[in-house]
């Protein structure tokens, strides 16, 4: 399962970020709570911004990289939970996303960063910037954990 985490991270992260929009199309249990058009536009703009690497030239700083990556994953889990409670995400979508995101937390460690090479190191270097989101870095530097 860990080998698939980063390959699935972009779709899972986007699911958590776009749950209010996506839930309207996949909600099975009950009708979704509709979002006003301007809110849907804001969600799409935020998701697009979070999917883009903002700063590529940061030096590798493992403590900062792990802190940023873990914070990003934890935030996605919290947003998913809030969207589930608020009726914007189905239980099935939440159940599909959370195990992989929770497993990812176990992979993101300072020791892993310090031993990283290649694309894995590039991911941690990307996460060394406070301006980058874990979704963007995972998308730009996908690796097998």
Label every PLM stretch briefly:
Residues 2-12:
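Bacterial N-terminal signal peptides that target proteins for export
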Residues 22-26:
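Boundary at the C-terminal end of the N-terminal hydrophobic targeting segment
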Residues 6, 16, 27-28:
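Generic N-terminal simple sequence motifs
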Residues 10-20:
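Bacterial N-terminal signal peptides
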Residues 88-145:
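Compact alpha-helical subdomains of small soluble proteins
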Residues 27-44:
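Short N-terminal segments immediately surrounding and downstream of signal-peptide cleavage
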Residues 41-106:
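Short N-proximal segments of mature Sec-exported proteins
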């Amino acid at each position: 399962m860990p080998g698939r985490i980063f390959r699935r991270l972009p779709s899972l992260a986007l699911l958590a970020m776009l749950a209010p929009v996506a839930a309207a199309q996949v909600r099975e249990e009950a009708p979704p709570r509709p979002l006003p058009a301007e809110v849907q536009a804001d969600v799409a703009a935020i998701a697009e911004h979070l999917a883009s690497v903002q700063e590529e030239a940061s030096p590798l700083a493992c403590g900062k990289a792990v802190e940023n990556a873990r914070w990003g994953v934890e935030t996605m889990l919290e947003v998913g939970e809030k969207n589930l409670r608020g009726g914007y995400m189905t239980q099935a979508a939440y159940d599909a996303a959370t195990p992989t995101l929770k497993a990812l937390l176990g992979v993101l460690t300072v020791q892993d960063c310090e031993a990283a090479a290649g694309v894995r190191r590039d991911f941690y270097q990307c996460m060394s910037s406070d301006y980058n989101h874990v979704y963007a870095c995972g998308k730009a530097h996908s690796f097998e954990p």
